[in-house]
Amino acid sequence: YGRSGYAPVFRYAEETFIASGTPTADTGLTLEMSAEYTEKRYEYLDRKLRERPCCIQHTEEDFQVIIADLQLGQGFVCTLSNGEEITALAITYPIGKANWRIGEIVSDTPATKTLLLQHICQSLNLPSIRVLTPPATGESQLLGMARIINAKTMLQLYATAHPELE
């Protein structure tokens, strides 16, 4: 990949969410675990990813490929909803025989993120689950590569966005 112009650039941190032994309170939010595509799920994920300062943006076609991969690997898109509105979403897949990982998680609030993780652990009967997140500080791992195809245009865009830099 390096000879083709790719460079490892996408860093993630891995955290372990430990489920509380206490059952989740009735919040009126509903957990749904499915490996089926819906436009509503894609639109929510897309909207929440666009709120991040830097991330991999997935097209609708990319999301459909992710769904197909989840179907093959017995994974799920897990959503927490209050009626018709999604409040949190996680892409969840098994790793090994008894472990699961959240490859992506987005939510309206930190509380709904925690509640979604708690519901997932209860539903899958897990004491804990691994969660990949954008790194805040500290240790991270490289999980993706990128290649700039049109360097001149990229540099012009960067210069426009950051005029204070020389």
Language-model-derived ranges and their functions:
Residues 1-2, 17:
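Short, glycine/charge-rich beta-strand/loop segments that flank catalytic centers
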Residues 7-111, 118-122, 134-135, 151, ...:
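Amide-forming acyltransferase catalytic core, primarily the GNAT-like/NAT-type
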Residues 122-128, 148:
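Structural alpha-beta junctions
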Residues 4-11, 140-154:
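Conserved acetyl-CoA-binding loop of GNAT-fold acetyltransferases
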Residues 2, 131-139:
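Conserved beta-strand-loop-alpha-helix junction that forms the acyl-donor binding cleft
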